[in-house]
Regions:
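Beta-strand segments within the central parallel beta-sheet cores of soluble alpha/beta enzyme folds
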Residues: 64, 249-251
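Post-Walker A helix-loop "phosphate-sensing" segment adjacent to the P-loop in P-loop NTPases
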Residues: 238-249
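Peripheral, non-AAA+ core regions of ATP-driven protein-machinery
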Residues: 1-234
Length: 251
């Protein structure tokens, strides 16, 4: 049986969509993984098989081929463990899920089926923000990060067993969080920045910094220790406009 599971890989800080294509068929048992996987991805088979066994399922009695598409993109990291496990369970007929294309899976599995936090969840969440029906399934430790993207459906799970039960029961709608987005009050600085009004003299430096702030220009302060470079630089945020939500997320 053939199954396609949605996930993402990172290229720098950019999230690239990846399809985990799993084909399990009768024949001499074997497992082939293609699609430019790195060492961590190639080793995922052992983690996934052990994690699947821990929840009482078996996916090893088939001739299995896994393709990570696009095939010309190098896949790195252990975040493909969860989508690979779900793909194997579906392709082998161990579980059945309604409309699996709704879900995007990310997560590293331990041998006992527990999910470990991963990197790059925010980049993936920002990519999915315009997909109203998409449900991002991630480790619970990453839910707070993903919830910074407003109105994204996020399902946090702590183990493979919890993920499978939610998918089988189609109970994700009750457990999925509709992300509230940014709360600016939680991002406010906890210290008082100095103000340009408190800086005596140095009119030329202040004027240059005001021009740099207004036009978004770079600047370089050079001078002897104690000349006021650090003080002026610390005053600069006070005259900058507030960042938009998108700018905050990108920073």
């Amino acid at each position: 049986m053939f199954q396609r599971i949605r996930t993402y890989c990172l290229s720098g800080i950019q999230a690239i969509p990846v399809s985990v294509e799993v084909d399990s068929s009768p024949g001499l048992p074997g497992f082939t993984l293609v699609g430019l996987p790195d060492s961590a991805v190639r080793e995922s088979r052992e983690r996934v098989v052990s994690a699947v066994r821990s929840i009482g399922k078996v996916v090893t009695g088939f001739r299995t081929t896994v393709n990570l598409s696009p095939a010309d993109l190098r896949k790195e990291g252990a975040s493909l463990d969860l989508p690979l496990a779900i793909g194997l369970l579906l392709a082998s007929g161990e579980i059945s899920v309604r409309e699996p294309s709704r879900f995007v899976f990310l997560g590293e599995l331990s041998l006992d089926g527990l999910l470990k936090p991963i990197h790059g969840v925010l980049s993936v969440a920002m990519t999915l923000k315009n997909e109203r029906e998409a449900v991002l399934v991630i480790p619970k430790e990453n839910v707070k990060e993903a919830s910074l993207v407003e109105n994204l459906k996020v399902l946090g799970v702590s183990s493979l067993a919890e993920c499978v039960n939610a998918l089988i029961d189609d109970s994700f709608s009750g457990g999925a969080l509709s992300a509230p987005g940014l709360h600016r009050k939680s991002l406010e600085l906890n210290y008082d920045s100095p103000d340009f009004a408190d800086v005596v003299g140095m009119e030329g430096v202040k004027r240059a910094l005001e021009i740099a702030a207004a036009g978004g220009h770079n600047f370089l302060l050079i001078g002897s220790p104690g000349a006021g470079k650090t003080l002026c630089a610390r005053c600069l945020p006070g005259i900058l406009p507030e960042m938009s939500d998108e700018e905050i997320l990108e920073s």
